[in-house]
């Protein structure tokens, strides 16, 4: 039986392949029900559903999948919780970013209009859509040439994953889709629109992905110089008053109440981003606590008290994570995806058979086989750029590399080298923060990869820092629920919600001095490879050769 006076909130976390809903007690953060709904369309990176082929580096989604999460995961989570839905007082969502929707003035996605069903640019561009790299290069070159004040806030480079590069690609490659797009909007804001019936824009995505700094987007003059006719993009398709994180976007509409089984009129929170929303769930709001949300990729987010310009970062935004602090973001484009790529493509079948016999996953089997090897015993160093480099090089045309293989090298050894490479990438990010005057005192890990104890110890040894772990297995969804509690008035601010509803296990992994010293030697080689191949000349050339070959 549940207390009839107890209040609950719902958080919905939209990932790359599925959406997760969690029902949470608003007073203490207890998660009483959860459910997951897989996207029917998944990620379209080779072709649309009708067979229309896609060029290299594309990644699209269908927005109906997002609504289906509300129709399926939320009612299922409510059912699993056993609570009276009338005790729910708020709902909040978070999303991968930058994932953007091209929509009409009333919020209808262009891909849902019959005349645009076969037009790739009418679909949602997922965060890992990297086909706008050339457009990002032009933005960076012009901004540097003109001395635009916002460029250093993003480490000196704008990513191909972000709003302006993606919008410029649409403008130049499908002018009809661009012309029909009234609102170019982050998916987290779009799904919030569907919940409350009103368009809102959040400060987080506007700052980190939309180049909104010091109260303004890039000027019309800059955009028109970038591509004639593109100058009205902000005024015509993007600009809207920004809402702080934790604010109430509106009340749940009757239609959305029908989808979700929640009471109409309850608070709908302003949208958020999956990584940033996790910070209060991990009780890591204090400056210097670097939160690494480790899954298919890793996003590093941290609050600070000073405004600093850090090379190769993803951005610094006033209030971008927590009101009252400067929020910093960095990241690695591929982490879990790299491990999955190796297992899916390069591991001999015998290892799969052994794992099946032991009733464990291949990932667990490979990890255990390599766990007892002394540091450096495989003689390998890898670059973790299989999905490009987000920080600190900001170049998604870079590619992965393993050096040191011999005829005696085994699959578990390569797998461990890949684990280590991702840890080296995180160390590179930490060192860059600290060299820029932004201290990192603690590494807090959230996401599915924290279950790999060997990987966590590697990160502690490589970074030389204690590792703390979030308690919740649904960090983003819990964080969204916490912001919903603020929007519903249960707490005055997210700091109070974090104290009451968040949880963390501090110092679970400590660096071992002997292993840490051995990793220092490997890291020197990683850094040498990083700097040598980081100019991108060879890797870009190889990618160009590949793209030309498959396009003919």
List each model region and its residues.
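Gly/Ser/Thr-rich active-site cleft segment
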Residues: 14-16, 103, 141, 145-272, ...
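Conserved phosphate/anionic-ligand binding catalytic regions in large, soluble enzymes, centered on
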Residues: 202-209, 270-271, 276-294, 298, ...
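N-terminal phosphate-binding loop and adjacent alpha-helix
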Residues: 36-83, 126
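Conserved phosphate-binding catalytic cores of ATP/NTP-utilizing and phosphoryl-transfer enzymes
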Residues: 1-5, 253-262, 272-289
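Short, hydrophobic/amphipathic alpha-helical packing segments
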Residues: 67-75, 164-167, 273-277, 335, ...
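Glycine/Thr-rich phosphate-binding loops that ligate phosphate moieties of nucleotide
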Residues: 1-45, 89-140, 176, 198, ...
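A polyampholytic, Gly/Pro-enriched intrinsically disordered region
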Residues: 55-60, 133-158, 288-291, 486-499
């Amino acid at each position: 039986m549940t207390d009839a006076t107890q209040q609950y909130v719902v958080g919905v976390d939209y990932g790359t392949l599925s959406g997760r809903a969690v029902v949470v007690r608003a007073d203490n953060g207890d998660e009483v029900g959860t459910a997951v709904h897989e996207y029917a369309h998944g990620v379209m990176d080779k072709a649309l559903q009708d067979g229309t082929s896609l060029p290299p580096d594309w990644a699209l989604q269908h927005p109906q999948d997002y609504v289906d999460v509300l129709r399926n995961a939320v009612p299922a989570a409510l059912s699993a919780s056993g609570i009276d839905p009338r005790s729910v007082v708020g709902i909040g969502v978070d999303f991968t970013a930058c994932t953007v929707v091209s929509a009409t003035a009333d919020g209808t996605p262009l891909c849902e209009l019959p005349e645009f069903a076969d037009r790739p640019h009418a679909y949602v561009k997922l965060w890992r859509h990297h086909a706008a790299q050339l457009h990002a290069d032009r933005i960076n070159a012009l901004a540097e040439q003109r001395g635009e004040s916002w460029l250093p806030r993003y480490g000196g480079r704008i990513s191909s994953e972000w709003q302006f590069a993606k919008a410029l690609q649409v403008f130049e490659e499908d002018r009809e889709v661009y012309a029909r797009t009234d609102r170019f909007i982050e998916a987290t804001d779009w799904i919030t629109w569907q919940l409350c019936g009103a368009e809102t824009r959040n400060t987080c995505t506007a700052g980190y992905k939309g180049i909104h700094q010091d109260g303004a987007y890039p000027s019309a003059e800059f955009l028109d110089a970038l591509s004639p006719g593109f100058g009205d993009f902000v005024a015509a398709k993007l600009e809207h008053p920004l809402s702080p994180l934790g604010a109430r976007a509106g009340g749940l509409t009757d239609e959305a109440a029908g989808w979700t089984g929640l009471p109409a009129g309850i608070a709908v929170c302003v949208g958020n981003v999956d990584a940033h929303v996790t910070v209060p769930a991990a009780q890591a709001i204090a400056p210097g606590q670097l939160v690494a949300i480790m899954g298919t990729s890793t996003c590093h987010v941290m609050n600070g008290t000073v405004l600093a310009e850090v090379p190769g970062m993803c951005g610094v935004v006033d209030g971008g994570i927590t009101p009252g602090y400067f929020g910093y973001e960095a990241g690695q484009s591929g982490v879990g995806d790299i491990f999955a790529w190796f297992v899916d493509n390069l591991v001999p079948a015998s290892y799969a058979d052994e794992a099946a016999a032991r009733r464990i996953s291949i990932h667990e089997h490979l990890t255990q086989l390599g766990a007892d090897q002394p540091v450096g015993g495989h003689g390998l160093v890898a670059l973790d750029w299989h999905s490009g480099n987000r920080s600190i090089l900001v170049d998604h045309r870079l590619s992965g590399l393993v050096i040191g293989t011999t005829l005696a090298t085994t699959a578990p050894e390569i797998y461990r080298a890949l684990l280590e490479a991702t840890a080296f990438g995180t160390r590179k990010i930490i060192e860059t923060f600290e060299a820029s005057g932004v201290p990192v005192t603690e590494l807090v890990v959230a996401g599915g990869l924290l279950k790999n104890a060997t990987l966590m110890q590697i990160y502690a040894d490589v970074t030389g820092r204690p590792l703390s772990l979030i308690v919740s297995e649904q960090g983003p969804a819990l964080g969204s629920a916490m912001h919903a509690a603020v929007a519903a008035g249960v707490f005055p601010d997210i700091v109070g919600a974090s104290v009451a509803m968040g949880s963390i296990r501090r110092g679970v992994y400590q660096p071992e001095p002997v292993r840490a010293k051995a990793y220092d030697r490997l890291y020197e080689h990683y850094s040498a490879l990083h700097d040598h191949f980081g100019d991108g000349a060879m890797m870009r050339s190889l990618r160009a050769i590949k793209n030309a070959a498959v396009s003919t």
